[in-house]
Each structure stands twice: as C-alpha cells, then as structure tokens.
Amino acid sequence: LLLSNTVEIAPLLCLVPRHPERFAEVADQIQDAGMKFRRRTEWIQTPKGGVDVDVILGDSMGEMPMYYSAADLVVMGGSLLPFGGQNLIEACAAGCPVLLGEHTYNFQQAALDAIEMGAAKRIKGKLLLSEPVALMDTLKELLLNTAELEKMSSAAKAYSIEHQGATKRI
C-alpha cells in the first residue's frame, strides 16, 4: 500500500513464508494491515486469476522458482531482521534482482559476490515494517528506473552462470 501510492502501477506483492506453520499468521498480518489478498492455492482456482488483490500469499511449498520467474524484483525477507537471510542464488538464476537487508550471515559470501556483480543491493537504514523508509525508497527507485532494473537482472543472470558447478569444483 505504501508503494502503490508512489508509483503509477500498483505492484503485486507475493509474500512467501519459509515455514508452512506461518501461513495463517502471515495471512492475519496482511489482513490486519488492510490489504486485499488471496492465498495462492485459492487464487489459481479463480478464472484468469482475475481477483483485485494487493498481495498473493504463497501457501504451498516447492514453488519458489515459479514466483521468481514471475517477479521483477525480490526482497529477501529473511535478511531484513537477524535471521541470517535466505538463498539468493535461486532468485538470481531466474534473473531477479535482489534487495537484501543487513543480516545475510547464512549466505555471506553469496551476498557479497552478488552485490559486487550488481545483481543485488544491500538496503541500510530503517527496515522495520513499522517504518520501512529505506526499503520503500529503494523499491520505488528501482521500479521507476527500468534501465537499472534490467541492468541488475542481467547481472543476476551473469552471477548465476558464474557460480554454476560449485559441486564439480570441490
């Protein structure tokens, strides 16, 4: 909602909790925030997905490649708070630019390499949902600057290609 007031096209937000036991909790949080949403399992049953929503809640497992293939940009939620981050390599393989918070210790080298190659940006500043200033500013900047978004997307693909075959090298 914050972002939809600042860009011409209201972005569709896909929230995908890492753990299934959080699906109901996240649904409640979205509803409490006053946002219209559908669970992905309900949304696909709607003809042509034709429901006016702000958020699609990913409520099934094993579908991240599908979300990445449909995304213009990924915010790696597990890095915004001290949870250590998530695997950004899959997002990069789909050509998705990645926005990271400061907490990437579970994927520290991968995050540093992606940032260095221009596939990811680290957001610093206030990242709490109660005051997401830095996150909103960065999202708005990228969504309005398609050339930069495309540049990051190309860098994400290049990053993925450069990091293929790690098992063979070990």
Model-derived segments and spans:
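Nucleotide-activated sugar donor-binding and catalytic core shared by glycosyltransferases
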Residues: 1-170
